[in-house]
Structures are given as C-alpha cells and as structure tokens.
Amino acid sequence: MLRYKAIVEYDGTNFVGWQRQQNGLSIQQLLEDKISTFTKQTVNLIAAGRTDAGVHALGQVVHFDLIAPNNSKDLACINKETDNKEVSKQNNTTTTIDSLKKMLPCRYNAYKLMSAVNYLLKPHRIILTSCEITTLQFHARFSAKARHYKYRIINRTVPSVIEQNRTWWIKPPLNVIDMIDASQHLIGKHDFTSFRSSACQAKSPLKTLTKIEVDTTNYPEIQIYFSAPSFLHHMVRNIVGTLVYIGLCKISPAAIKTILFAKNRAMAGPTAPSSGLYFVKVDY
C-alpha cells in the first residue's frame, strides 16, 4: 500500500461542498473520479476539513491510498521514511528513498499522477498544487495540529464584479476598530456554542482559537484570519457575521463576551456568506 498526501486548491462556487452528496457535484467526488480514472483503482479521499458549498480552498490537504505494484520490494522503506535517507548500497550504487519513489511505475509516481489528474480536472476550477508519497502513519485529518482560514470582505459603496462569489460585499462603512477590539475576546479556549450551527456534529463545543486578526492593509478589502487546531461547523462564518454586526453598530463590542458566555446561537450575528471563506492551510 502507498499513501499519498496532496494539497488542493479550488473555487467552491459551483460545488455542493467537499463531501460527496446526492444533490450535486462535490469536490471529493470529482477528485476521486479523476484519480481513479488515471490509476485504475478505486480511491477514498480523506480531507483535513470538509468545506461547505461555496467555500474556497488555497491549501486543503488530503490523503489517499493506492495498492502498490507487487514488485515494489522496497515499499516498506517508502512507507516508513519521509526523509531522503540511504536505504541500501550495492555495486557502488546508493539507493535512497527518493530514488525508490522515482522507480515506481508511471501511475504511482506522485508528480506524474498529479499532472495527469490536473489535466483530467479541466475545465473544473480545482487543481492539485502538490502531491507526494508519505508514510502510512500520516492522516490528513487526525495528524493536523492547526487549521488556518481567512474571510474576505469588500467594504465600499458598490460591489466588486471581479470578486463576486469570492467576497462578502458590505455597503455601509464598518467600524473596524470595534471589530478588532471585540475579536480579541474570542481568543483562547472557550465554549463556542453561540457560534456553532444547529447541524454541528462535534462532540464538544470547546475549541481553542489561537488567532483572530482583522487586516485592513488593502482596504476597502478587509481580511479576517483565524487559526485553531479545529473548528465547529459554521464557527468562522458565525463569528464573522457577529463582527460585521459590531462593525455596523448593531451589536456593541462589549456584548461579544455576553454572547460567548450565553451559549446561545440566537444572540450572535448572522452566518456570513460562504463565498468569502477560504481554507488557507494546515499545519502538521
């Protein structure tokens, strides 16, 4: 068995989300179908995060397994080692992990697999930006130490034609200072019940938010960055919706603590549109 780790970039606009569904085309379904077409094997993709319909990704991480060719006698070395270390030396020829990977048949070579799948994905707005053989111990979801998201807002009197379906347009001017002040009360380990969706299946509402940063460097675009080991369903979008209400003076900045401690979704702001959300990267 060979395990592959890939990084995926996609525009989520025309998809029903990451996960396979019966009511439309998902990113998982399309990727699995194209990988299977090239490798002639059925594959099951495991993702670091299951993004909703309309959510984009710059660095979604996935893993999948392929049944290796029977003559891969050095397969155990590939599966156990991630570094390009020396594994054997015969007749003055040194064999390394990287050289073993390059000797794999075409459909098992990570770079050739990536190139072929990217070709098959056209014209869909999905692309593999990297692909490598990793250890069998790697798990895209459970090995993750931190996940990073960003949310993009356009704050001006007219919407952006170019950024349609990629941002949330807010016409009235936002009080960004109040948004920044309020956001800092959410950093740390808290019960985020007030910011989780009713459909959230997480066993516990306790999450540790390590970063919220409101960036106005490119105003009228506002980018809000989030980092945490994991998130609740709709947690980022519900926080953004609440911060926007604070920026519009519909909620006072001081009320953010009351909302957090109330553990009541009805007290927080609306769920921000999926179009402005990006899954940026995963730390392992």
UniProtKB/Swiss-Prot annotation:
The keyword Isomerase applies. It comes from the Bacteria. Its EC number is 5.4.99.12. GO terms for molecular function: RNA binding; tRNA pseudouridine(38-40) synthase activity. Pfam families: PseudoU_synth_1. GO terms for biological process: tRNA pseudouridine synthesis. It is an enzyme of class 5 (isomerase). SUPFAM superfamilies: Pseudouridine synthase. InterPro entries: PsdUridine_synth_cat_dom_sf, PsdUridine_synth_TruA, PsdUridine_synth_TruA_a/b_dom, PsdUridine_synth_TruA_C, TruA/RsuA/RluB/E/F_N. The keyword Isomerase applies. Substrate binds at residue 149. Keywords: Isomerase, tRNA processing. It catalyses: uridine(38/39/40) in tRNA = pseudouridine(38/39/40) in tRNA. Belongs to the tRNA pseudouridine synthase TruA family. Homodimer. Formation of pseudouridine at positions 38, 39 and 40 in the anticodon stem and loop of transfer RNAs. This is tRNA pseudouridine synthase A. It comes from Orientia tsutsugamushi (strain Boryong) (Rickettsia tsutsugamushi). The lineage of its organism: Bacteria, Pseudomonadati, Pseudomonadota, Alphaproteobacteria, Rickettsiales.
